[in-house]
């Protein structure tokens, strides 16, 4: 009996071994499929969230920069409001040395030097590097830029617009000032995550559809939604910093934590009741219809935008009266 059992044992052991090998093969197949799926997901995620500059040929189509148009875009964009020294006036407002610290729920962003200085500023950048930073949020080394820089609005500038602006900015005084790095905690200090933010919120299309807009309103739409980047402050945001859908220019909490930013749609209790002429006057002089004056962070905005021709201020006013009331 014992002899017969001992003779069967090798067969049983061999049988179990075959089962083990079959199970191991199945697990290996499952794990292999899992690895492929994870790898494919990682590749897809990278493809969707990687920095996406314009094609190189996009910038080669421009000709000589129109410096007068570039200056208008400079003032419309409020470049001096963030990149010049606080309170700078006259020619000092054209020294874009950086220095402003923007406090947000995500940390503190230090506004950089964008003067023509080749080391501390952007003087060594090519048009493509400048343009991709402005309109795609991609830095000179191919990195994501944080959306504290409003490239989501500047994305509406054409290649010619960017060329004109950069041409003008290269005529401004250089500065050797060097700003400290941003002060952001994890995970906001990971630029890779910005690619996911762009996937969710970066959009270069119209913020609102205005089917019956005339040329004046269309010009105002370009100025407000594009270089003027009015929505960056006047539109409420969600927890991830994206615009609240359907609330364009409806106002909301001050992103820097103090007070609120007003509603500037026709549904506002204040500016909503103003006429186009009154809005134009406010943008030009800083005085409201009640003879009050502009205050807070809007002081710097109004000071910059007042450099625009009256026709542009009228276009902005027409657009603000045309957007949906909120």
What is the meaning of each model-derived region?
Residues 51-75, 196-225, 268, 273:
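Electrostatic cytochrome c docking/interface patches
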Residues 1-68:
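N-terminal export/targeting leaders of redox proteins
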Residues 32-46, 157-221, 236, 312-319:
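Extended surface/linker regions that mediate inter-domain or inter-protein docking
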Residues 140-143, 240-241, 271-273, 286-295:
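Substrate-binding/catalytic groove segments of enzymes
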Residues 99-131, 152-162, 247-288, 301-314:
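Electron-transfer interface patches adjacent to heme c in soluble/periplasmic c-type cytochromes
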Residues 53-58, 68-71, 84, 91-120, ...:
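Sequence context of c-type cytochrome heme-c attachment sites
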Residues 107-109, 185-204, 236-268, 277-278, ...:
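Primarily the internal scaffold of c-type cytochrome electron-transfer domains
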Residues 70, 76-86, 130, 165, ...:
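The canonical Cys-X-X-Cys-His
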């Amino acid at each position: 009996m014992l002899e017969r059992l001992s003779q069967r044992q090798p067969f049983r052991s061999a049988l179990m071994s075959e089962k083990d090998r079959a199970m191991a093969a199945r697990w290996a197949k499952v794990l292999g499929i899992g690895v492929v799926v994870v790898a494919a997901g990682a590749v897809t995620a990278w493809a969707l969230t990687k920095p996406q500059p314009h094609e190189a040929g996009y910038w080669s189509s421009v000709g000589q920069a129109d410096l007068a148009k570039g200056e208008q875009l400079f003032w419309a964009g409020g470049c001096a409001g963030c990149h010049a020294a606080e309170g700078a006036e006259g020619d000092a407002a054209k020294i874009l040395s950086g220095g402003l610290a923007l406090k947000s729920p995500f940390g503190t962003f230090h506004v950089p030097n964008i003067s023509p200085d080749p080391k501390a500023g952007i003087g060594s950048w090519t048009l493509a590097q400048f343009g991709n930073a402005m309109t795609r949020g991609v830095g000179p080394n191919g990195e994501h830029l944080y959306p504290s820089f409003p490239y989501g609005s500047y994305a509406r500038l054409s290649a010619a617009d960017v060329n004109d602006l950069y041409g003008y900015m290269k005529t401004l005084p250089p500065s050797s000032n060097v700003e400290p790095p941003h002060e952001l905690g994890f995970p906001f200090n990971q630029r890779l995550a910005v690619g996911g933010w762009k996937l969710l919120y970066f959009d270069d299309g119209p913020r609102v559809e205005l089917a019956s807009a005339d040329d004046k309103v269309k010009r105002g739409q370009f100025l407000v939604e594009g270089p003027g980047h009015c929505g960056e402050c006047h539109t409420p945001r969600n927890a991830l910093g994206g615009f609240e859908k359907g609330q364009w220019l409806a106002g909301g909490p001050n992103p820097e934590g103090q007070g609120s930013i007003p509603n500037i749609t026709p549904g506002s209790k204040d500016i909503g009741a103003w006429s186009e002429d009154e809005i134009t006057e406010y943008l030009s002089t800083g005085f409201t219809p009640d003879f009050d004056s502009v205050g807070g962070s809007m002081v710097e905005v109004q000071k910059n935008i007042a450099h625009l021709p009256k026709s542009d201020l009228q276009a902005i006013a027409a657009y603000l009266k045309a957007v949906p009331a909120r």
